[in-house]
Amino acid sequence: IIPLHGQSIVWVEPELFSNKGGWSIDAQFIDQVGTPYLLAHGLGEPVQNATMSLAFPETGLYHVWARTKDWIPEGGGPGKFMISLEGNTIDHIFGSDGVNRWHWEYGGTIRIDAPMIELSLQDITGFDARCDAICFSKEKIILPDDLQTIDEYRNKYGEIDKNIIYEKREFDLVVAGGGVAGICAAVQAARLGSVSYTHLRAHETRSNL
């Protein structure tokens, strides 16, 4: 359950869904969006819905946005999904607005009739739907696209742990990249009893693990 912060704004980080269904956490574009996000990759078959319980400060009509992108704006491409609340699907297909960059895609409005509802992400194409954040607001506001302001919104409205403790540690081996060589190096280090740290999706190496 996401706790509420702010006035009539509900912010959802999809990677915190309690039931991710067939969706998985991905971080390939973390340099562009700031945090991990949910990815639906079903090899052409829509994956199971991701669901969670979500609390609202008050009932009524809410505007809805999802932070995503249209991967192939020419039409008919992958990466499309829908959002439903208590089984009521918002009449909008996200990832289909022709904007080929990460941005807030407006999905229209939906009426919330209970303080606690089930939120679902519904994959449509089975190919790489991605959702970085969802925002509900009583007012039709302008949401930020720059990462610094987005982080401020996350800290203000989202379920963000503000007491993160960073621990410095020493490692015998650092594996950068998750290809065949990186995986073999990490496995062999573990067999030899070395302390192995595997760095997934390093921006510099463009790892695809």
Annotate each PLM feature.
Residues 1-7:
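Bacterial Sec-dependent N-terminal signal peptides
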Residues 7-165:
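Extracytoplasmic
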Residues 168-178:
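Beta1/beta-strand and adjacent pyrophosphate-binding region of the FAD-binding site
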Residues 170-172, 192-195:
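Loop/turn elements at helix/coil->beta-strand transitions in domains of secreted/extracellular proteins
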Residues 181:
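Hydrophobic/small residue at the entry helix of a nucleotide-binding pocket
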Residues 189:
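Aromatic pocket-lining residues of Rossmann-like dinucleotide-binding sites
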Residues 198-205:
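Conserved small/polar residues in nucleotide/adenosyl-binding loops
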